[in-house]
UniProtKB/Swiss-Prot annotation:
Region listing for Disordered, in residue ranges: 395-443
Stored SUPFAM superfamilies: Chaperone J-domain, DnaJ/Hsp40 cysteine-rich domain, HSP40/DnaJ peptide-binding domain
PANTHER family with a match to the protein in the record: DNAJ HOMOLOG SUBFAMILY A MEMBER 3, MITOCHONDRIAL
Biological-process GO terms, alphabetical: embryo development ending in birth or egg hatching; mitochondrion organization; nematode larval development; protein folding; response to heat
Official protein name in the record: DnaJ homolog dnj-10
ZnF CR-type: positions: 178-257
A GO-annotated cellular component: mitochondrion
CXXCXGXG motif repeats, residue ranges: 208-215, 231-238, 245-252
Record gene name: dnj-10
Transmembrane segments: none
Name of one Pfam family that matches: DnaJ_CXXCXGXG
GO molecular function: ATP binding; heat shock protein binding; unfolded protein binding; zinc ion binding
Biased composition (Basic and acidic residues): 395-429
Length: 456
């Protein structure tokens, strides 16, 4: 790209994709270069945003927002989206500023309206494009997009309307105990600049010239009949706003960010909604309760698992049990088995729509040690020796049990009269040792056996 200097007649070669900046009026002369996406033609800015050249500031801002939702780098990670977002940000920066827009409409970017009769080089964009700064100026909030959720746009600092419903994540403990939460929401309030008058400060509304301040106009029908309709110009107000407020665009209200504090009721369930008033606005907060690692909730009752040792299960004792309002010690009766269910009355969740609290249920689990010390094993064997088993055996006590069974049988045989010795031998069979025979040795002759005995 070459730029003609008309005063000197020289042709200077400019760097591609760098917009030229006019010389500042201060004593220090600097050239602030703007890295643009491409050389835009006169219609390009409008085409980039998808708006007409007659679009007002509100339509341009809305179009920019719709495109930002689609191409912002925090939402769309592709390189094409980054380039597109740079383009729409550049276009919005020019078209949202009245002075820059007038200059752009007059000169374009590649020459004047007649194709080159404008100023040298046509329209040149001044300053550095910071897409985050442009976005911040357009919609408020921080420059970055961290934590920005386009699905909940109305709840964010960048929204065009007040938030009517929002979802809040709370912990299990906050839900059952209650908590105080702070949140930032969008509300529609009177414009801070015009205070709801819709008129630029220093000006007043005038009487509507189309209805003479009546708010209605008369129209004549065929047959000589007349009927009145609402004035389309003033919409029935009877006033004409010649100087609308620039901040609210004559609406009298703007979306403003408010910090509000509210109480989460104790006993809140997952999915419950809370309605409260923020100025003139109603806000519904729906709670998303995170699951607990300790408790399981069933309506107003809570359940928890409690581990006890083998000795506690047999002998009884006390155990520390977690609760929603703090830990407590509970007595464990002697002989408590695993999966025993115990109840603590009134230790559950506070009832939202009635008095009192639910109950807390403990599910006992007896923990059995996998490894024992030598001392512990001897103690367990001594205890096991005193047990009367109906079926089965205990590892480590098999020999003692077999000896006792033999002695019992002998005593029974002595008491029985007329029992023969053969019957006693049959009642006490003795296992014999069997020799293992090789199949090849079974078919050997007499001399082969002698030879094998002598020579091996």
């Amino acid at each position: 790209m070459f730029v003609l200097n008309r005063s000197s007649g020289l042709i200077h070669r400019s760097v591609p994709l760098l917009a030229q900046v006019s010389t500042p009026t201060t004593s220090t002369t600097k050239l602030a270069q703007l890295h643009t996406t491409h050389a835009l033609s006169k219609e390009d800015y409008y085409k980039t945003l998808g708006v007409d050249k007659k679009s007002d500031a509100k339509a341009i801002k809305k179009a920019y927002f719709q495109l930002a939702k689609k191409y912002h780098p925090d939402v769309n990670k592709t390189k094409e989206a980054q380039t597109k977002f740079q383009e729409i940000s550049e276009a919005y920066e020019v078209l949202s500023d009245d002075t820059k827009r007038q200059e752009y409409d007059a000169y374009g970017s590649g020459g004047g309206p007649a194709g080159g009769r404008g100023g040298a080089g046509g329209f040149h964009h001044h300053g550095n494009v910071d897409v985050n700064e442009i976005f911040r100026r357009a919609f408020g909030g921080g420059g970055g997009m961290g934590g920005f959720n386009f699905d909940n746009f109305a709840q964010s600092a960048f929204g065009h309307s007040a938030a009517q419903e929002m979802v809040m994540d709370i912990s299990f403990e906050e839900a059952v105990r209650g908590a105080t939460k702070n949140v930032s929401v969008n509300v529609v309030e009177d414009c801070l600049k015009c205070h709801g008058t819709q008129v630029e400060p220093g000006h007043k509304k005038t009487s509507c010239p189309y209805c003479n301040g009546t708010g209605a106009v008369s129209q004549r029908l065929q047959g000589g009949f007349f009927y009145q309709t609402t004035c389309n110009r003033c919409r029935g107000s009877g006033h004409y706003n010649k100087n609308p407020c620039q901040e609210c665009e004559g609406e009298g209200q703007t979306v403003q960010r408010r910090q509000v504090s509210f109480n989460v009721p104790a006993g809140t369930n997952n999915g419950d909604s809370l309605k409260f008033q923020v100025g003139k606005n109603q806000l519904f907060v729906r709670f998303n309760v995170a699951p607990s690692l300790k408790f399981r909730r069933e309506k107003d009752d809570i359940h928890c698992d409690v581990d006890i040792s083998l000795a506690q299960a047999v002998l009884g004792g006390t155990v520390k049990v977690p609760g929603i309002n703090g830990d407590t010690y509970v007595h464990i009766p002697a002989g408590t088995g695993s999966h025993t269910k115990m109840r603590l009355t009134g230790k559950g969740v506070k009832r939202l729509h009635s008095y009192g609290n639910g109950d807390q249920y403990m599910h006992i689990k007896v923990t059995v040690p996998k490894y024992l010390t030598a001392e512990q094993k001897q103690i367990m064997l001594a205890w096991a020796a005193t047990e009367q088993l109906k079926d089965g055996t205990i590892k480590g006590l098999e020999k003692n049990q077999k000896t006792e069974e033999k002695e019992t049988k002998k005593n029974e045989e002595k008491k029985s009269e007329g029992a023969s010795e053969s019957q006693k031998r049959r009642s006490e069979p003795v296992a014999e040792n069997a020799e293992t025979i090789d199949e090849n040795q079974e078919n050997e002759g007499f001399f082969e056996k002698i030879k094998r005995k002598i020579f091996g």
